[in-house]
Amino acid sequence: MASKSSRSQEHIRNFCIIAHIDHGKSTLADRLLESTGTVDNRGKKTQMLDDLALEQQRGITIKARAVAMRYKRDGIEYELNLIDTPGHVDFQYEVSRSLACCEGALLLVDAFQGVEAQTVANAFAAMEHDLTIVPVINKIDLIHARPDEVAEEMMNSLGTDPDECKRVSAKTGEGVAALLDAIVDSVPAPTGDPKAVLQAMVFDSNYDDFRGAITYIRVMQGTVRKGQKIKFLRAGSVHDVVELGQFAPSRVPCDELVAGQVGYLICNIKSLGDVHIGDTISIAGNDPAPALPGYDRPKRMVYCGLFPSDGQDFSELRDALERLAVNDPSFEFEPETSDALGFGFRCGFLGLLHMEIVQQRLEQESDIDLVQTAPNVTYEITDKRGVTKNIHKPQDVPDPGDIEKFCQPIVRCNVIVPEEYIGPVMKLCQERRGIQKGHEVLGASRAMLTYDIPLAEVIYDLHDRIKSCTRGYGTLDYEMVGYEEADLCRLDILVNGNRVDALSVVCHRADADRRGRAVAKKLKSEIERHMFEVAVQAAIGSRVIARETVPAMRKNVTAKCYGGDITRKRKLLQKQKEGKKRMKAVGNVEISQKAFMAVLTDGE
């Protein structure tokens, strides 16, 4: 690639690939990179754009990526900028950032699995951004592929024309050349004046220990050059451009990027707070360009506590979280303390997979062993004085007598299932207190069920349960619809009369008895026996609803007595009883990390 990267705007195409998880986005991206000669056979590997170790390991895309490809047709060289996006519902924020940088989208659907819940959600998101959609049916090489039926499904659910669907096999490369032509013909060229005042959007960033923050940008107006002074409008900071360039797919420096191009900037930014994803970059002068409308800030739906297993690692955990926040601004954290687990952080996530991924990235990238508390959602509570506040952790829920109104978040779930599994899925949604809102037939054998379900019922294992009762064919997508009043309560766990804050949960009153008994029973089997008996109780306010007792270890004090008067034995047993009573009054019950983890990972 030449060092001077700018080119005529009508020869630039910015597009992304959107699809349900596992429909072959990253594999198709690999074929496009090979077909355009962006990577040679030496640099070839599978899932070239998934460069996080976790992405390669789990076979899913977590972070958005950008790569510039050169494609020659009829003697004209086109620049095709592909922005790879994640497919899972938890990474919707990454998808929306990618869509804001594109003019077109390849809507990829598996030729066997057909339209899935996330396909519908991503297609509507692309339509909201006014993107030109190119429908693509992938995996046509499969023995069980049914491209004609899938094209009909796409027409029924998304309104696409079956004749316009491009048919490809990302695995074998069949149909990829025709797809490249379709991108050039269908996706509009970017608009924007290269001579106007610089206006560029920050759509991602990551942190390099040697170079500082590497900022991914899409230039909307004007031109950015090496050595130029630029300003981050939201942060208000001014920096010199030390290096800029494009990804192919590794970094390739160039002298300038013009309106319509996608690339990266390095400004030796060491302060993590200076780069905000969604910020606007302009010239550092008196009249910079106006700020672009930012992305919608993502709402954190799920909260949990993260604590280092070893208290010595607290400052390392804080540094690791700060580094990760530069690259993934969709989660937030604040310090918190727990009597049981010590110092740690309360973290907010977009969903359960997002929480799991962040925890694994922290453990892999910073080598810290973590303990995680039970996930919970954000509740809205109005007290007797009429003051409404958001509650992120169960410990902050006031006593039942102080609550006027207790509201929980409700999500609208779209579940796409084969017809023969509709019954079990409806039963499952009703068990989770769901209210049916719609039932739509998608094709000959599949339907989309729409339910409003409390988010707290979704975050634990609804996705897994849907997969298991549909033999893996059901798919789930959800979006927030608002808050609704419900009969909720805080369930506390008391050990030896003391509340264990890390085990408190908010649950529906009708489910509290079952849940309390299950946790007490599990904890009884995990707590080590002491010299005195330990009571494990589940309580709502001051009312105990379940109790288990861990029996005491006792020494056989009457072993040395043989024959003789019974009063001698009674005297020794009474003395032992009094000693245990004294011990119980002053004794502390240690709950091991293992016991916590057993209860928290039990799904209860």
Swiss-Prot record:
It is found in: Cell inner membrane. Its main location: membrane. PROSITE patterns: G_TR_2 (PS51722). Keywords: Cell inner membrane, Cell membrane, GTP-binding, Hydrolase, Membrane, Nucleotide-binding, Protein biosynthesis. GO terms for cellular component: plasma membrane. It catalyses: GTP + H2O = GDP + phosphate + H(+). InterPro entries: EF-4, EFG_III/V, EFG_V-like, EFTu-like_2, LepA_C_sf, LepA_CTD, LepA_IV, P-loop_NTPase. GTP binds at residues 22-27, 138-141. Residues 10-191 form the tr-type G domain. It is a peripheral membrane protein. The keyword Ligase does not apply. GO terms for molecular function: GTP binding; GTPase activity; ribosome binding; translation elongation factor activity. GO terms for biological process: positive regulation of translation. Its EC number is 3.6.5.n1. Required for accurate and efficient protein synthesis under certain stress conditions. May act as a fidelity factor of the translation reaction, by catalyzing a one-codon backward translocation of tRNAs on improperly translocated ribosomes. Back-translocation proceeds from a post-translocation (POST) complex to a pre-translocation (PRE) complex, thus giving elongation factor G a second chance to translocate the tRNAs correctly. Binds to ribosomes in a GTP-dependent manner. Belongs to the TRAFAC class translation factor GTPase superfamily. Classic translation factor GTPase family. LepA subfamily. This is Elongation factor 4 1. It comes from Rhodopirellula baltica (strain DSM 10527 / NCIMB 13988 / SH1).
